[in-house]
Amino acid sequence: MAKKKRTPQEQSADPAAQEMIIRAEELGIGTAFTRADEMPPCNIGGAGMCCKICGMGPCRLTKEGQTGVCGATIDTIQARNLTRAIAAGAAAHSDHGRDMAFTLKAAANGEAEGYYIRDVAKLRNVASYYDIEIEGRSPEEIADELADLYIAQFGQQKGEIIPAIRAPEKRKKIWKEQGVWPRGIDRETVEALHRTHVGDDQDAEHILQHAVKTALADGWGGSMIATDVSDILFGTPAPILGQANLGVLKEDMVNVVVHGHEPTLSQMIVAASQDPEIIEYAKKAGAKGVQLSGICCTANEILMRQGIPAAGNFLHQELSILTGAVEAMVVDVQCIMQALVGLAENFHTKIITTSPKVKIKGATHIEFDEHKALTIAKQILKESIDNYKNRGKTQIPSDKEDLIPGFSHEYINYMLGGSYRSSFRPLNDAVMSGRIRGVAAIVGCNNPRTQQDWLHTYVTRELLKQDVLVVETGCGAIASAKLGYLLGEAGLDKVGPGLKEVCEAIGIPPVLHMGSCVDNTRILTVLTQVVEEGGLGDDIDQVPAVGLAPEWMSEKALAIATYCVASGAYVIFGGASPVSGMPDRMSDSDIVLKHISEGWEEIYGGKLEFIPDPDEMIKATLEHIDKKRADLGLPEYDPDRFGESGDARMLELEELPLSERREAIYGVAAD
């Protein structure tokens, strides 16, 4: 039986989304929100109790002591299902890293049209990690050798993947002792599938040990490679002004929405859209020009580097088409709904697929090739412009918010100390003193089974009140952007007194936008630098920090969570657990759930837990942060200790007569 249909307000916390959901209902068009209401999740598969890896099944285990046809127990089945999901997520992000490495190779050899090395400093810095000779060599020579090194990590069969040497020393020792330092990125993913094939690995803890190894191959391998190469080719992000939400679409311009995850495509479309040839072509079609905007992680990529506006996050992909104002949605890989083509048939929008890995029946396919990138980008834009004349009635929401994205770990290092003394020391000192209680990384997807954006923004808002500095990536970052949390002055009246002092003194927003979902490796880099700076322990598991994915839905999220746990982080997911079982009926169904929490914590110092209630999620976050503070011997968090200093306080003091100012500052009267 379908559950009760939700109102637009219950389906999304975003007014722009609500407006488009109402329009969809008026037009009789279904969306992910209505499909989620009409299609209740399978309670057996959703709890990880269904096995379908062979032709003897599918086997559903719903009773105490029940096994599959082959004799597989519930813990074996759940461990296999979870590991396969982690392998799929790791494959998706790591394959993206592979493509980026090949693009770097082509650019270094002058074989990639329109691409060149934008950040030579980042190139030299990354190369130095791996003892690649940089003195007396051109950027292209360095990039060519770095690309070869990175490409080799995917097919390597023995040894250790090299990007992981950048982890803290104590963490690397744990990985070696546990035998989970990945040998090669592809090898671990292949072995994960082999181990979970019927008749293979049947010990849940042993299976999950390899899940960790597979995830690490992504986080400290493929994803880290992707972020490094993106910065080298397109520039390391620094703060820039942007906008977010459906109101960024323009009535008098050709609207092209790019959606997916590959910056090689989106960055080139940005370049092509600014070409005088394309601008003139759009004007001849009756438009003022081309308005680019992004959806999902592609949005974050072009937002944080060029300031191109974000039309929204994952659940906005259908809603943007519902405006009737989008000439083309250009997609590549990951998080792309097959429903887009059917939806677009109700309007004039063209769905253009571009990746050799992704085709959607009914979509226009223009395959992207980095060797002819600019030419193909212009072809895509011209096809979009040609569609402008077919536009019908439009309804573009007015909602949009300014934001400041682009806080790479390099920029955070710079902003804390400036050009001559860049350092994480001020951040560490702020945590040690208690001005910053701890750090929360709030990341991940939207899920139409929850109220879109609400969990992201509620958790963010409540943690800010408790002096927790928040860093965000992916769709979670766009959720906060749509509410204006990513501006320097935004919400400081609702931020705890200590965090407010830090934000005012440095000139940063209380929520730092750190990029796309693949850029979660930037957070690992920040945590590593925090450890290396000193004062907050000698490994990541000692830092007062928590990772949260309140609205997760993707296998990639499970891979990210696992490599963060293996790096020492406490990770909390909202929503349903994929390995929950039915503990009220099956006492052996929580073995896997306990192992990824208590078992992994004992081994790695990090743990993964699923907490659907947002208030319990916040409580668990603060308890963990406070425990880590106590373990480090730091002062107990006390919000009353702060709030009377910082730039705002100095401005207040300047208004006082000189005789009163000294007494206010030093507590003694003037002579």
Language-model segment annotations:
Residues 2-671:
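Anaerobic metallocofactor- and corrinoid-dependent redox/one-carbon enzyme cores
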